[in-house]
Each structure stands twice: as C-alpha cells, then as structure tokens.
C-alpha cells in the first residue's frame, strides 16, 4: 500500500446499527438476570456477548486506521476510550458513594474499597483477592458488576500496543491471527486448569487471564471478517448461508440464556469458548451490509436500547442492589421490579444524555462554570456537589460509620473474619457485622453439657454459631460464608477425621450456596463412618433449593445413621426469621434453627 505513514486521511468506519441491536439483547439479558435469576438463568452470558463485540469492534477500528494511514495513534485511541467510558463511571461512583453514605452507611468502607478499585479499573482482581462470589447475591455490593468494565479497560490499554507491535513486525496478517488464536487457547486452558484445581467459579469468571479468550475471539473475527471490507452485493447463496448460520446461532444463544445457570459446570470447561463462537457467527451476519438478519437487528427499538446499553449496564445493578436491600429475597413484590426498571431507565437516560454523550463529543468542555452555558453549568454544579462527599468518602472521613473486620479470637475457633467479603467464621463474643455491634442477647438459660457435637456449615451456621455455643459449650462449630458442600470433604479429612464413632454427632448445614451431586454428598457422609449425622435442609430463594432438599431427604432415607432436620418446613411462613436476603437469619431465626437442631440432637 503506497501511503506516507500518518498523513493519509483516515476515513471513519461505517456505523453498524446491527451491533447496537445485539448490544440491546445482551444488556436486556443481563438486567433480567440481575432482577431475578429464575427468570433468565443464563442471562449473565450477555457479558460474554459484550466481550466478543468489544474485541471485534476495537480491532476493526484499529485495523481500519492502520490500513488508511499506515499508523495507529495510540494516544488518540486511549483519549477516545476515556472520554467514552470514564465520565459516566465516575458519576455512577459518586452517586453510589453518596447514596451509600445516606442510606447504607454501615457499608461505607466496603463500598469505598470497591470505588477505589473501580476508579483504577481493577475491580475484577480486587474481587478475586477478596474471594467474592459473583453469583452470590446475598450481600450489598452495588458496584460488583464493574468487574467486566475493568477487564475491558485493561484490554483497551494493553491490546493496541501489542497489535501495533505485531503489525509492524509481521507482514502476514493471518500469522497475527494465529498468534491471537493461540493466546485465546492458552486463556481457555487456564480457565479449565484453575477450575479443575479448586472448582472456584469466581476466580475463573473474574480473571482477565481466563476471560481473555472471549475478547480475543472477537479480535480474530476482525482479522477474518473486517466490516470495512465486506461487499454490499455478494451472491445470493452467500447471503443465504450467512443469514442461516447467524439465525441458527442466535436461536441457540437465546436458548442457552434460558437453559444455562451459574451452576452449569461445563461452561467453565470450554463452554464459554463455544458460546463465544456462536456470538462470532451472529456478529458476522449482523455486520454484513446485505443480510436480512442485519436488518432485523437494526430495528429502531433495539438500536435505541443498544445505544444506551453502556448506561443501562452501569446503573441497573446499583439500582437493584439498593432497592432489593429493603426486601426479603425470594419474597419481593411485583411492583418492586417496576421500580427497579423505572429507576434504571431514568438514571440511564440522564447519564446517556447529560454525561455520556456530551463528554464523548466535547471532553472536559462538557463542564463549564459560566452561567451563560446553562447545560454545562448545571452539569458542573451537580458534579461538584457530588464530588465533595465523594472525596471525603475516599479519604476515610466516614469510616466510623462502617466496619471492615468482624470477630475476635475466641476459644477454639479460627476467627480471623472479613465481613465485607464473605469470610466470616462463627464468633462467640461480640459480633461486628457491617458496623453494627451485636452484644449477646439474653436467651434461654438451658445449657447442655452432656453433648459435644460437631457442626459444619456455611453462613447460616455462622449466624447461629454464637447462640448455639452458649447453649452447647462443648460443641465444635466450623462455619464459613460462601462454603459449598463439594468444598467440605478436604476440610473434614484434614481436621475432623476423628468423628467416626457411633457415639459422635455431626450436624451438616450445607446447600445455601449451590447444588451438589449424590456422589459428592455420599463421599462426605461416608467420611464420618458410623457417626450420627444430621442434615439441615435449606431455605434459599434460588433455583437449586428444591434439588438440594430432595438430595438431603433421600440421603436420610437411604442411610440409617442420617437424620434430616427440616429447616425448610420449620421456617415456612416465617419471614421474621430472615434478613432481607431471605437466607441469613435474624435473631428469631437463630433461635428457631438452634431449637430444631437441639431437638434432633437430644433424641440421640
């Protein structure tokens, strides 16, 4: 190509409305999933759709610039990205920080830390470091969804540099494509390897290294199918093939939105890769200028939503987190969802019109202190008003209203507890949760010194730990928030292998955080030999509740040394037992569950 580098005029790539239509489908799936998982169990796959689109579109823009000018102006690219993404995020962070201070002040430290991570676009690594479960919706974390933006921004920072280097050193583009394909396979392998080691969904879900596979598939498509080189009038048979493959892929993707859930293990063993390939086929058909599927995705309603997909994504989760925190999860009235949707639309539209669009077009000039420029002046006044409490939050001026660490060393418990990120261990003395100090409440004076059971469980066990220990001083309690049944066998082998005699009593309260198989349950039960085992079933507003309770009941029928403690039945109709998440226990719930367990243990 004969051109002087940097001087040939760059022609802007044509607008592709079908991609906005696809963005609309993706963001609607995500919003529905976060409103209520049971409505669209695989809606979280919309994030992967965004990743593939981002990889494809960014690479296409960069390749177009390189083909037109012989150079890629990295500084200009990064400035455009910042103008497009950063202002709306900063406003979201300021609003969420201020709202947390006013409405949820006991969470201010947690949210402050999340804000700092979001500012530097490292939210995903922050949540990995704090062992946060993405699919766990029991805690108030209104910025947790920013993990995906962190991955995209990290991609925007490093990928262009790598692309420019490869373009300047390797002349054959198919070789560059093979390099990116190889890296995507490595990323896929990392996800499969890490998941096989510890079965940790969140590590592989949040990790830039493990999610890079999806972005790079979009990159590869840009090399194979650049939108600026597609012909307007291909042969009819070609259009038919493109439309057929794209339509079939879209139908399968939508079916997966309904079929897959966060407990579907195969998606971590290559599933995300295959699903992203489906998205590639959809994109390939949508960006072609002559296909009918492109016309369908260019529907004005879908395009309208798609153009606002960034703002909708930013605001929906924060709105849902605040609104739902005042209701019991699983018992949310229908009108609350209308409130969620209405507030999301309002905030997203305000953000799109008055933050996202002006800053994208004008940059810092979108702010102005001169009253004659009314929109800019109002925008500036609002930003400054929010900025004052925001900066005070960041410097820790309001830390006194929230607590970051709870629990103390007590008796035989390991009580190094981080409340904010779901790492509580059952304490005995004072409990500090989200800034609230809960002194021991006066309970029944009955003390049972003649039994010494082992209790293993998740966050519900943590909730009853203090109360149960006061009634059964010789009990041994091991509760950890987020624990799942499949994670418990190594713990038992390492620490509790002595509980195998027929005189031993073992209480297992597991199932709050996810499903398990018959084999996983039996392997755990068999580890306790002849001990009397008591299985506490669960009440959790999640799709796996019924199956968990069925497996526990079946085990009690199959094994003579296993007894079912029917917490599901005992708690039926007692919303006063539960915190707003519908799972964790208020004081009355603590006493009720303790009573159920004690009744079973006293029968021996």
UniProtKB/Swiss-Prot annotation:
Q: Which residues form a coiled coil?
A: none
Q: What class of enzyme is it?
A: transferase
An example Gene Ontology biological process: lipopolysaccharide biosynthetic process
List residues traversing the bilayer.
15-35, 43-63, 85-105, 150-170, 176-196, 212-232, 240-260, 267-287, 310-330, 332-352, 377-397
Give the active-site positions.
459, 581, 584
Alphabetical keyword list: Acyltransferase, Cell membrane, Membrane, Transferase, Transmembrane, Transmembrane helix
Give the domain of life: Bacteria
Q: What is its main location?
A: membrane
According to its record, what are the GO cellular component terms? Answer: plasma membrane
**Family, per the entry?**
Belongs to the acyltransferase 3 family.
Name this protein carries in UniProt: Putative O-acetyltransferase SACOL0978
């Amino acid at each position: 190509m004969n051109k002087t580098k940097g001087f040939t005029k760059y022609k802007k790539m044509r607008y592709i409305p079908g991609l906005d239509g696809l963005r609309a489908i993706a963001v609607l799936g995500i919003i529905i999933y976060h409103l209520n998982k049971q409505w669209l169990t695989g809606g979280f796959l919309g994030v992967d759709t965004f990743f593939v689109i981002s990889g494809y579109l960014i690479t296409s823009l960069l390749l177009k610039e390189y083909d037109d000018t012989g150079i890629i102006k990295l500084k200009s690219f990064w400035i455009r990205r910042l103008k497009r993404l950063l202002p709306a995020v900063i406003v979201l962070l300021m609003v969420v920080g201020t709202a947390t201070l006013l409405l949820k002040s006991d969470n201010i430290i947690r949210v402050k830390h999340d804000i700092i991570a979001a500012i530097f676009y490292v939210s995903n690594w922050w949540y990995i470091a704090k062992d946060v479960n993405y699919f766990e919706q029991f805690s108030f974390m209104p910025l947790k969804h920013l993990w995906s933006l962190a991955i995209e921004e990290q991609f925007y920072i490093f990928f262009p540099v790598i692309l420019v280097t490869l373009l300047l050193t390797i002349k054959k583009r198919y070789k560059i494509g093979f390099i990116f394909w190889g890296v995507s396979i490595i990323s896929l392998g990392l996800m499969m390897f890490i998941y096989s080691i510890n079965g940790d969904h969140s590590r592989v879900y949040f990790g830039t290294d493990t999610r890079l596979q999806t972005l790079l598939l979009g990159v590869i498509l840009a090399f194979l199918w650049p939108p600026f080189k597609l012909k307007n009038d291909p042969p009819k048979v070609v259009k038919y093939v493109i439309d057929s493959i794209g339509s079939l892929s879209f139908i399968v993707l939508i079916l997966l939105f309904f079929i897959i859930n966060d407990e579907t293990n195969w998606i971590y063993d290559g599933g995300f890769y295959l699903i992203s390939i489906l998205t590639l086929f959809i994109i390939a058909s949508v960006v072609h200028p002559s296909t009918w599927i492109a016309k369908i995705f260019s529907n004005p309603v879908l395009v309208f939503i798609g153009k606002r997909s960034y703002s909708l994504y930013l605001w929906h989760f924060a709105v849902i987190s605040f609104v739902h925190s005042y209701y019991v999860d699983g018992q949310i009235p229908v009108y609350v969802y209308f409130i969620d949707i209405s507030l999301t639309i309002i905030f997203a539209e305000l953000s799109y019109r008055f933050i996202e669009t002006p800053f994208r077009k004008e940059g810092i000039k979108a702010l102005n202190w001169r009253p004659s420029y009314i929109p800019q002046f109002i925008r500036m006044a609002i930003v400054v008003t929010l900025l004052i409490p925001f900066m005070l939050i960041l410097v820790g001026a309001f830390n006194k209203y929230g607590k970051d660490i709870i629990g103390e060393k007590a008796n035989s418990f390991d009580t190094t507890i981080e409340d904010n990120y779901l790492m509580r261990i059952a304490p005995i003395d004072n409990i500090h949760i989200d800034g609230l100090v809960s002194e021991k409440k006066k309970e029944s004076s009955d003390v049972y010194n003649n039994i010494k059971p082992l209790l293993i469980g998740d966050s519900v066990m943590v909730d009853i730990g203090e109360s149960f220990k006061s009634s059964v001083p010789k009990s041994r309690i091991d509760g950890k928030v987020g624990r799942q049944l499949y994670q418990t066998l190594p713990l038992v082998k390492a620490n509790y292998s002595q509980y195998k005699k027929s005189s031993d009593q073992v209480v297992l309260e597991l199932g709050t955080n996810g499903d398990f198989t018959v084999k996983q349950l039996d392997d755990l039960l068999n580890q306790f030999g002849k001990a009397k085992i008591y299985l506490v079933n669960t009440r959790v507003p999640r799709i796996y509740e019924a199956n968990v309770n069925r497996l526990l009941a079946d085990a009690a029928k199959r094994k003579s040394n296993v007894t079912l403690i029917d917490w599901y039945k005992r708690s039926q109709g007692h919303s006063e037992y539960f915190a707003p998440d519908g799972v964790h226990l208020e004081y009355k719930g603590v006493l009720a569950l303790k009573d159920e367990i004690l009744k079973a243990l006293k029968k021996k």
